[in-house]
């Protein structure tokens, strides 16, 4: 009988632990529901705010790609799908350059990314002739910017 008495409290302890985990889970489940209700209630208020709030602008390079295309080939157009691909390509290249330049700054224990880190990152990321042309155009752009 004594062993059975000991087992019962042991069985109750996990049950109590389960209840506490259930109690912990219940508020977690209720929070998303409350979160879902807030936008619905705020939906009518947000509808009033939407008039005040302008639509978020998405920054793209589409106009710049188009300008460069017209400089190089004035008689050629570009489809929206191709423009999207070019925009993604430029975003990817800039992301790689930013990662490489931040890595270089970290290696040299510098808190600031300067034009030197960007130039070195361009040389590391872009291949051969493309890197040389990019560096010369970048140097020209920085010189023009600082002189004006």
UniProtKB/Swiss-Prot annotation:
User: What's the protein called, per UniProt?
Assistant: Probable histone H2B.1
The UniProt function text for this chain reads: Core component of nucleosome. Nucleosomes wrap and compact DNA into chromatin, limiting DNA accessibility to the cellular machineries which require DNA as a template. Histones thereby play a central role in transcription regulation, DNA repair, DNA replication and chromosomal stability. DNA accessibility is regulated via a complex set of post-translational modifications of histones, also called histone code, and nucleosome remodeling.
Query: Which GO terms of the molecular function aspect are on file?
Result: DNA binding; protein heterodimerization activity; structural constituent of chromatin
Subunit arrangement? The nucleosome is a histone octamer containing two molecules each of H2A, H2B, H3 and H4 assembled in one H3-H4 heterotetramer and two H2A-H2B heterodimers. The octamer wraps approximately 147 bp of DNA.
Which SMART domains does the UniProt record give?
A: H2B
PTM sites of type N6-acetyllysine: 7, 36-37
Modification after translation (UniProt)? Can be acetylated to form H2BK6ac, H2BK33ac and H2BK34ac.
User: Crosslinked positions for Glycyl lysine isopeptide (Lys-Gly) (interchain with G-Cter in ubiquitin)?
Assistant: 144
- Bias (Basic and acidic residues): 1-32
**Might you report a single GO cellular component term?**
nucleosome
Q: Where is this region: Disordered?
A: 1-57
Q: What keywords are annotated for this sequence in UniProt?
A: Acetylation, Chromosome, DNA-binding, Isopeptide bond, Nucleosome core, Nucleus, Ubl conjugation
| Pfam families, per database record | Histone
Species of origin reads Medicago truncatula
The record, for InterPro entries, names: Histone-fold (IPR009072), Histone_H2A/H2B/H3 (IPR007125), Histone_H2B (IPR000558), HISTONE_H2B_site (IPR055333)
Main subcellular location of this protein, as a coarse class = nucleus
Q: Where in the cell is it found?
A: Nucleus; Chromosome
| Protein family | Belongs to the histone H2B family.
Q: Per its UniProt entry, which superkingdom is the organism in?
A: Eukaryota
């Amino acid at each position: 009988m004594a062993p059975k008495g000991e087992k019962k409290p042991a069985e109750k302890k996990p049950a109590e632990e389960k209840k506490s985990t259930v109690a912990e889970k219940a508020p977690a489940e209720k929070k998303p529901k409350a979160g879902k209700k807030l936008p619905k209630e705020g939906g009518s208020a947000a509808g009033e705010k939407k008039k005040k709030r302008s639509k978020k602008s998405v920054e793209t390079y589409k106009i710049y790609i188009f300008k460069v295309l017209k400089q190089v080939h004035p008689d050629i157009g570009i489809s929206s799908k191709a423009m999207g691909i070019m925009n993604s390509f430029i975003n990817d290249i800039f992301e790689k350059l930013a990662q490489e330049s931040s890595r270089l700054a970290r290696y040299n224990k510098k808190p600031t990314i300067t034009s030197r880190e960007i130039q070195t990152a361009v040389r590391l990321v872009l291949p051969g002739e493309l890197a040389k042309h990019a560096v010369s155009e970048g140097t020209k752009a920085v010189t023009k910017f600082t002189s004006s």
